[in-house]
Amino acid sequence: MKKASRSVGSVPKVSAISKTQTAEKIKPENSSSASTGGKLVKPGTAASLSKTKSSDDLLAGMAGGVTVTNGVKGKKSTCPSAAPSASAPAMTTVENKSKISTGTASSTKRNTSTGNKESSSTRERLRERTRLNQSKKLPSAGQGANDMALAKRSRSRTATECDVRMSKSKSDNQISDRAALEAKVKDLLTLAKTKDVEILHLRNELRDMRAQLGINEDHSEGDEKSEKETIMAHQPTDVESTLLQLQEQNTAIREELNQLKNENRMLKDRLNALGFSLEQRLDNSEKLFGYQSLSPEITPGNQSDGGGTLTSSVEGSAPGSVEDLLSQDENTLMDHQHSNSMDNLDSECSEVYQPLTSSDDALDAPSSSESEGIPSIERSRKGSSGNASEVSVACLTERIHQMEENQHSTSEELQATLQELADLQQITQELNSENERLGEEKVILMESLCQQSDKLEHFSRQIEYFRSLLDEHHISYVIDEDVKSGRYMELEQRYMDLAENARFEREQLLGVQQHLSNTLKMAEQDNKEAQEMIGALKERSHHMERIIESEQKGKAALAATLEEYKATVASDQIEMNRLKAQLENEKQKVAELYSIHNSGDKSDIQDLLESVRLDKEKAETLASSLQEDLAHTRNDANRLQDAIAKVEDEYRAFQEEAKKQIEDLNMTLEKLRSDLDEKETERSDMKETIFELEDEVEQHRAVKLHDNLIISDLENTVKKLQDQKHDMEREIKTLHRRLREESAEWRQFQADLQTAVVIANDIKSEAQEEIGDLKRRLHEAQEKNEKLTKELEEIKSRKQEEERGRVYNYMNAVERDLAALRQGMGLSRRSSTSSEPTPTVKTLIKSFDSASQVPNPAAAAIPRTPLSPSPMKTPPAAAVSPMQRHSISGPISTSKPLTALSDKRPNYGEIPVQEHLLRTSSASRPASLPRGPAMESAKTLSVSRRSSEEMKRDISAQEGASPASLMAMGTTSPQLSLSSSPTASVTPTTRSRIREERKDPLSALAREYGGSKRNALLKWCQKKTEGYQNIDITNFSSSWNDGLAFCALLHTYLPAHIPYQELNSQDKRRNFMLAFQAAESVGIKSTLDINEMVRTERPDWQNVMLYVTAIYKYFET
């Protein structure tokens, strides 16, 4: 703490002051006191504190230093030789505390371990020098000044390295959460208290050392020059050693500066990579605050009080970037390298010193040139220290809070994206199953279409039959247009069948062509492989023949060698026999010599025996050598015979194997040749087939070109119908918009709805009775149909004009009633399977409103325009007010009794069937046909099994009709079946989009805004709450924790329920209660707990998003 809170007066020194001090203090400052601070400045000294030099460490250190050292300013630190040894436990405590800090790099740990070793060795040297100086008992005023300079240097080195570590610590601690920071602050507060105790202890020790050394504490700075001269008088012999030590220190400091420059560059690159910059500046208020704390006066006392003065200020030093200060320090050392004064080092190290504020202040401080000539007064430094620390803490807290918000928003967005991906996977699976189901239904519809086509042909044949009967009875008729349209329908159906068959045959022929081409390619590839195999086999056969020839040559050479060896053995045998005979002769001679010796002169015999003995030995040695040669020759002959036998066996085996391989290769070659011939014949046949298929394909292309012209006409008709459908959808959207705009008025009539339940029950019973009556009328109509069919056969001979008009009008009316009943029964079945299976207040009031409009029969016959609303899209009565019901009762009344349908029965000539059979042969309703609201329900039929079953039931009912009824229904039944077709309402894309929007209301919002659903809903909320005060929606957690966002969002729709101008962010419970009550008043159920929302600062974003989605779904879909 003593190093961290040094005086500011020694920091903002200018170069002129440094040079003046150098001139004044060069001799007295180079006293023997330099031996006490020999190599105090080491990288490890600052590295041992590097783990705890984050922004919170420096703030705590600064606060602790200011509170303790105000009482000792202005005093001269004469003997701080015990300070390094006393600061060693402090550094140990810092190291122990730093073990719990997070985000420290591995390089800092290595520097810390190195710094511990160096600091321990430095402490040992300082203790020895302190003992030597105490034994001499010399005046130590200069020694105190020298120690002061060393302490300043150590502090400046610590501060410089702290700044470097600070930026690194900031980049490492950016991602730490709030709980870790709070724990770290508590630990640093404990550390500050410990440092306060250590400072008090060190101050006591300093006083004791001054008392022991006899230094007068009341010396003024004016007596400094006389004290230095006295010190020079007492210590003339220590100057040279001090100069050498200072030179060594200069060299070491220069090396350390280079090392710190490299580290600074690395940290700057790292900060730039993280998005920060060392060229950032404080804002205007912080600059003004920093300038007010400066003063244009610098006293010599403020320049000389060193480690003992601990009244440092945050804004009083010369601020600047770390690299600029390091470069200044290096330049100062190069300029004053030969000055050899302690004060020179003091001024240089004070320039290096940085204000020990947070890492943000170190990065945002202005350059040193802005405040280089502005010194400060002690009082202004004391006053500005606490304020600057508060500003730094506030700035750091705000940045930490902003980082936390960004981190939570990012994590929230990632979770929402993952959840949407899972939903998309599920939707994909559902769409696949839906596609399969639609495929099955398509097959059913195709079968039904085929049956309808058969029925159409059957009906056309019956019409021809009835027409022939009319011709026989000489009854005139004018239905040429109908006949033409029927024939055209038949021709068009046949054309569709022919086009489908042609397309199918073309695809089949193309498949056959592709198959044949693939087969041809495979045959060519097999032929190529066979040729390659034949070549390889031939090459192998030639190789085998060459091996056989080489083996035969080797065998002949071995045979020649064997003959030579045999001749050698025979000659050796002859030589051996000759030697044996010679040996026998010699033995006889020896025997004769023995006999002569026994009988004659022994001396001559002795010589002769000696000569004979020598000849015998020579002969024996020659015989033994010959025998050895013979044995070797025999062994060689035996070995060669064995080798020859082995080679002969191998040669025979190889010859047999080669013969077998040659036979196999010949067989394979024959087989491949036969296969190749077959492939060639197949290839020629395939080419001929391909040529024929190409001709057929050209013919089919010409037919298809002709077909496409007709199909284009049909597609134009389909596009017109789609335009009509889009117009109707826009009209439906306008009705929904009106319903939302007038929903506020409906809330005033909710009390009246309670009294209408009894009336609704009565209406329901009346409706049930009416349904029974309609069923009874249906049965009677069917009986009348049978009776009229019999009467038709009886009155064929009456007048043609009267009978024709009456029969056609009546049968048309009956068919209209039957179609209306079918549609009404289908509508009742759909309503029974809707989202509200049980009768509720809304459905009862809806039936009551519709029943109240029964006396107006004219509305039932109004033909619907393309912009008129669909009956199934009519809003429920519970969602509109009585005034709205009266205003829109005309165009959207849906449940009028079916008896009104019989009042408006159009004539047969008014139905333009031929036009729609001409334009909409595939799946379109007759647009110009007048129909009632019950007929319009066919538009909303979806493709389902129920529709196919109804089709089959209608077909079976039509099969059982009499021939007379078929004549009347022959031209209208295709129209009815086509108008009730499930595919006549909307396209599959529109249906799937409607289903998707009903299932997930955020899909349309995501398509509108782009991006994910979460981001789209967030943009929608921002757009709706734009212009509201105190509203900043950036996520779904902390942006909604005060309830104002909910109130603003609902205020856009329900301004009468929420007095937004009276709300404030402090009363959270009231805000949430108002918002939830307003939402519940329109039917939005609250899924959030008020107590939990009030208690937590960051609620669960998924629950909040679900509730906001419910609000969007209610008001926007």
From Swiss-Prot:
Keywords: Cell cycle, Cell division, Cell junction, Coiled coil, Cytoplasm, Cytoskeleton, Gap junction, Phosphoprotein. Residues 93-117, 293-303 have a biased composition (Polar residues). It is found in: Cytoplasm, Cytoskeleton; Cytoplasm, Cytoskeleton, Spindle; Cell junction, Gap junction. The keyword RNA-binding does not apply. Its main location: cytoplasm. GO terms for cellular component: cytoplasm; filamentous actin; gap junction; microtubule organizing center; spindle. May interact with both microtubules and actin cytoskeleton. Residues 1-176, 293-323, 358-390, 919-1001 are annotated as: Disordered. GO terms for biological process: actin cytoskeleton organization; cell division. This is Cytospin-A. The modification Phosphoserine is found at S384, S385, S389, S868, S881, S887. Residues 1011-1116 form the Calponin-homology (CH) domain. InterPro entries: CH_dom, CH_dom_sf, F-actin_Monoox_Mical. CDD domains: CH_CYTS (cd21199). Residues 168-280, 394-449, 487-807 form a coiled coil. Disulfide bonds: none annotated. Residues 45-90, 358-377, 971-990 have a biased composition (Low complexity). The keyword Methyltransferase does not apply. It comes from Pan troglodytes (Chimpanzee).
